[in-house]
Amino acid sequence: MNRVLRLAAPLIVASFVAACALSPGDSYVGGLETPADAQVLAAGMVEFVGAQLPAASSTVALDPTPSDQASNTLTPAFVAALRDRGFAVADAGQAGTAGTHHIRYLVTDLDNGDLVRLSIDGGAEASRFFVRNTAGGLQAGGPFTVRQMAEAN
């Protein structure tokens, strides 16, 4: 139990730190070590989105990152991976269209890897840690931890 607490505590703290610095509708991408990191993270993120939404009939809009992160490498990799999976990705002008699903993503460097947090329409939330392998590349450190928010009546 003590080991689990020691592993979970940094993840929880990193989640709170990333969330405190943002507006409620912002996404966030911390510094990625290599360009290949964006591809690995994007593929993992699309895996979760694909499990939650039907690709062929879903339009998604990504919550924007702050202006100082506009040139991050993850956002275009995530958009490309979503399109490759069959999702329609709305641009900023289409984001308010009825039926569009909103995705917020937070990526924070943590220990020897990156912590990814995703939410879809403020409902389904997921977290996954990506760890560096012995070759220096990122790989999933386990499955997504998913929390479904209860629907308001």
Briefly describe each language-model feature range:
Residues 1-20:
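Sec-dependent bacterial lipoprotein signal peptides
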Residues 10, 50-52, 108:
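Generic marker of residues within folded, mature protein domains
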Residues 14-39:
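Bacterial Sec signal peptide processing site at the extreme N-terminus
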Residues 27, 38-73:
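Post-signal-peptide N-terminal segment of Sec-exported extracytoplasmic proteins
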Residues 56-153:
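Intrinsically disordered, glycine/charged-rich N-terminal periplasmic/extracytoplasmic linker segments
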